[in-house]
């Protein structure tokens, strides 16, 4: 099974360079076009899980009308820095934030906490892929759902998925970049997860 981990398309807050955590703007026109490109890239024979925030739900619905909302895929809580430009984060706080994954921004969430909740989702998805429940009634009896899975989420959860796939800590967050509407691919097998590609934007440059 292949796991597609997708970042939502662009919002106006992204376009303005604001830190965007739990605030809930929808996609802008660019973001909607990006969502269509993502949908074309992953196809429609997939299961789709999404963060509850609008920008992810709108991206997910470009892929499928049948989506499952999972609150654990929500973006990092930036606390009092949500919807503020990075330059407004005091230098000493920014330095500590980057150095320590257990650092909690005022009113917010730590990267350790985020990593734990995202890993829960990924562990469940992997378990279902490797040992799928089987129907015992009707035409579907004995036929597990072996479709690939798409997770539509945000920057920080995608970095947590990267850490999960590589078996490393959340320190990797500050050493990686996740573009809007990018696709990260992770193979799941009995041997565990394997990173196939990270932050691919090839589908966004297609005519």
Predicted regions and their residues:
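Short beta-strand scaffold positions
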Residues: 50-51, 116, 152-153
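Generic beta-sheet signal
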Residues: 3-4, 46, 145-153
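Conserved histidine-centered catalytic loops in small-molecule metabolism enzymes
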Residues: 43-72, 187-207
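Short active-site segment of divalent metal-dependent hydrolases/proteases
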Residues: 11, 157-158
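Phosphate-handling substructures
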Residues: 63-120, 197
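Acidic, low-complexity terminal tails and accessory targeting/binding regions
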Residues: 79-88, 132-147, 163-207
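Generic structural signal for well-ordered alpha-helical scaffold segments
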Residues: 36-40, 115, 119-130
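Active-site-proximal alpha-helix that buttresses catalytic centers in soluble enzyme cores
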Residues: 1-66, 109
């Amino acid at each position: 099974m292949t796991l597609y981990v997708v970042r939502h398309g662009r919002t106006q807050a992204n376009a303005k360079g604001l830190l965007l955590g739990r605030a809930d703007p929808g996609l802008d026109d660019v973001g909607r076009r990006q969502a269509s490109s993502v949908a074309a890239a992953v196809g429609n024979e997939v299961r789709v899980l999404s963060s509850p925030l609008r920008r992810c739900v709108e991206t997910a619905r470009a892929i499928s009308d049948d989506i499952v909302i999972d609150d654990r895929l929500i973006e990092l809580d930036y606390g009092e820095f949500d919807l503020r430009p990075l330059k407004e984060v005091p230098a000493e706080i920014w330095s500590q934030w980057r150095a320590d994954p257990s650092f909690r921004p005022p009113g917010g969430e730590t990267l350790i906490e985020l990593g734990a909740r995202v890993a829960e989702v990924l562990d469940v998805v992997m378990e279902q892929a490797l040992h799928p429940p089987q129907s015992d009634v009707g035409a579907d009896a004995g036929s597990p759902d072996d479709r690939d899975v798409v997770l539509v989420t945000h920057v920080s959860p995608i970095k947590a998925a990267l850490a999960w796939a590589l078996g490393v800590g959340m320190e990797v967050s500050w050493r990686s970049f996740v573009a809007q509407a990018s696709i990260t691919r992770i193979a799941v097998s009995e041997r565990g997860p394997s990173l196939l590609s990270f932050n691919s934007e090839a589908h966004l440059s297609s005519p």
